[in-house]
A protein has these predicted regions:
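Basic-flanked hydrophobic alpha-helices used for secretion and membrane insertion
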Residues: 51-292
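Feature of multi-pass inner-membrane transport and sensor proteins
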Residues: 1-30
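Histidine kinase transmitter module recognition
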Residues: 17-21, 56, 304, 311
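Alpha-helical transmembrane segments of integral membrane proteins
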Residues: 28-38, 286-306
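Intracellular alpha-helical coupling/juxtamembrane segments of multi-pass membrane proteins
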Residues: 17-18, 278, 285, 315
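Hydrophobic alpha-helical scaffolding
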Residues: 4, 39, 174-177, 241, ...
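Interfacial "coupling" helices/loops that link adjacent transmembrane helices in transporter permeases
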Residues: 300-320
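Alpha-helical transmembrane segments
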Residues: 24-26, 34-62
């Protein structure tokens, strides 16, 4: 009676058919549910795939990276016609002894990270490392301006970037600051076995180009080119925002050939090309998965129509 009131005559007939052939109707319902669930699951997976394939690149302010044996090579590359806006980053390691004083300067988050990922010097003593990265003058001036600073005030000190993201032992994402240091503090450590005292002129979460990789166990000191030229550096890289990365590829290859450089001397990474390659792979997977969804959906729809048609033919009198 309730079904008749709500769904009228059609509902009553459907209910009778359900009672007569429960297995067939369960199969029909299951087919519908499975088709919908698979469609939603695979669609979400494909969207996630596209998102993840480009997330690493699209969040950056550069689309071309060059690694070279010397900073002079990078300076030459910076003069190529299609280089666009660029930043030349030089880097080194600032090493500190993990003594009681330094441990007291770590936050609880920092202690957790350092206990899990510790480093040792050549004598087996526990140490803590901070990446020192310099920017060429124009890039450093723009960076300092963006964080509300002044070049002349900041050029002899270090800007602390200390917003770390990592994963715990359970694979859960964790985030925090590793040090209790603040603006005006002085930190003592070694660069290439020579002792230096570095004054922290600012603390920020804003990262310059080339310092976007958050999954690490170390913080960063961002310094001027003048500063790192005094202390020395181990490696250098150029980060560019080019309007035509394919043309820039050709120009870099030509420069490489003219100077008889090998990949160990000069290596370029076209991020636009990588995005295209990854998206092509995801597209092929998408076509396959959507084809699979189509087959499953077609089977489900066929089952539904077959069941409905069969039952209608068997119960023509009731419909009449």
């Amino acid at each position: 009676k309730i079904i008749t009131k709500i769904f009228k005559t059609g509902g009553e007939i459907a209910y009778k058919n359900l009672k007569r052939s429960k297995k067939k109707y369960r199969t029909t319902v299951i087919s519908i549910i499975v088709s919908v669930v698979i469609f939603i699951a695979i669609s979400s997976f494909i969207q996630y795939g596209f998102k993840m394939s480009s997330a690493y690149y699209t969040e950056k302010n550069y689309n071309y990276v060059v690694y070279a044996r010397t900073a002079e090579i990078l300076t030459d590359i910076s003069n190529l016609p299609d280089i666009g806006e660029y930043s030349i980053n030089k880097s080194n390691i600032f090493e500190m002894n993990m003594d009681d004083k330094h441990k007291s300067e770590l936050t609880e988050y920092g202690k957790n990270i350092k206990n899990r990922y510790y480093a040792e010097d050549k004598n087996g003593n526990l140490i803590d490392n901070i990446n020192i990265i310099s920017l060429n003058k124009s890039s450093y001036e723009n960076y300092v301006k963006n964080i509300g600073g002044n070049y002349e005030t900041y050029k002899d000190g270090a800007i602390l970037v200390d917003n770390n993201i990592n994963v715990d032992d359970n694979g859960k994402r964790i985030q925090g600051s590793m040090y209790t240091w603040k603006k005006g503090d002085t930190v003592t450590g070694k660069i290439d076995d020579k002792e230096y005292s570095i004054k922290i002129v600012s603390k920020t979460e804003e990262r310059p180009n080339g310092v976007e990789n958050l999954y690490n166990t170390e913080a960063y000191f961002i310094v001027s080119e003048e500063f790192i030229n005094k202390t020395g550096f181990k490696s250098a890289a150029l980060y560019a925002q080019s309007n035509d990365t394919d043309k820039l590829d050709e120009e870099v290859e030509q420069y490489k050939t003219e100077n008889s450089f090998t990949n160990s001397d000069l290596n370029a990474f076209n991020m636009e090309e990588s995005i295209r390659a990854e998206n092509a792979v995801v597209l092929v997977i998408s076509i396959f998965l959507y084809g699979f969804i189509g087959v499953i959906t077609l089977i489900g729809i066929t089952n539904i129509f077959n069941t409905i048609t069969t039952n209608m033919n068997l119960r023509k009198k009731e419909f009449a």
